[in-house]
Swiss-Prot record:
It holds the Pfam family SfsA_N. One of its GO terms (molecular function) is DNA binding. This is Sugar fermentation stimulation protein homolog. It comes from Alkaliphilus metalliredigens (strain QYMF). Belongs to the SfsA family. The gene is sfsA.
Length: 232
């Protein structure tokens, strides 16, 4: 499960975050405005002076000419692009690289269930359905403990509760936490940041929703799902 990072990539120095979607980065002597590909807080990563990796984008409709893709943090690269977990899992399911789901031969994206649009759905020859939600994780605490979310997430809580209801209707449901850095060895929901999300996860586990977490190998050229992590 590997996604190559295409386009012209440029290093810069992070200056400040203007809002959830926009930041200022210094490239050489020039201050440029960049799109932040993740609405999470990422306060431990996006600090003034942090070295970051940008991608140049030349599209007329865009308000910015750069995407902020990665942050150099404590000797490693951290990918912040929140769209990549969906793409990585889609590739993994298509190529049958995830053993627990290798009997499913049809993969659909952006599937509506209840009041939510979930990331993926799998269907096998017996027409059994699995609903999948992917979560982008960038936060690692205590040197090795990955945690989600890094900001309160009503949307994430709603997705977990929708999957809980689906499982109660005999539909298989799973949440994948994709930690877009390689230093994580364990994962836990971030109760301190969002107790409602943690409670939703606890209830979902009791109902039978499946939870998986993986770290990733991240380079300037690609990101790949690596090791499965212990969840507690």
């Amino acid at each position: 499960m590997k996604i190559y990072i295409e386009g012209e990539k440029i290093r810069g120095t992070f200056q400040k975050r203007v809002n959830r979607f926009i930041a200022e980065v210094k490239v050489g002597s020039q201050l440029v405005v960049v799109h932040v590909a993740n609405t999470g807080r990422m306060k431990e990563l996006l600090t003034p002076g942090a070295e970051v990796l940008l991608r140049r984008v030349n599209e007329p409709h865009r308000k910015t000419n750069y995407d902020l893709l990665m942050v150099y943090h404590k000797g490693i690269l951290v990918s912040i692009d929140s769209k990549l977990p969906n793409r990585l899992l889609y590739q993994g399911f298509i190529n049958k690289e995830i053993v627990a789901f290798d009997k499913f031969n049809e993969v659909k994206r952006e599937v509506t269930y209840g009041k939510s649009r979930l990331d993926l759905a799998l269907i096998n020859e017996e027409k059994e359905l699995v609903l999948i939600e992917a979560k982008c994780v960038t936060l690692v605490k205590e040197g090795e403990l990955a945690s989600f979310p890094d900001a309160p997430t009503e949307r994430g809580t709603r997705h977990v509760r929708e999957l809980t209801e689906a499982v109660k209707q005999n539909i298989r449901g799973a949440v994948f936490f994709i930690v877009q850095r390689e230093d994580a060895v364990r994962f836990t929901p971030n109760k301190e940041m969002d107790p409602q999300f943690q409670q939703a996860v606890t209830e979902a586990k009791k109902a039978g929703v499946e939870f998986y977490a993986y770290n990733c190998i991240v380079t300037e050229d690609y990101i790949a799902i690596n090791d499965e992590l212990e969840i507690f």
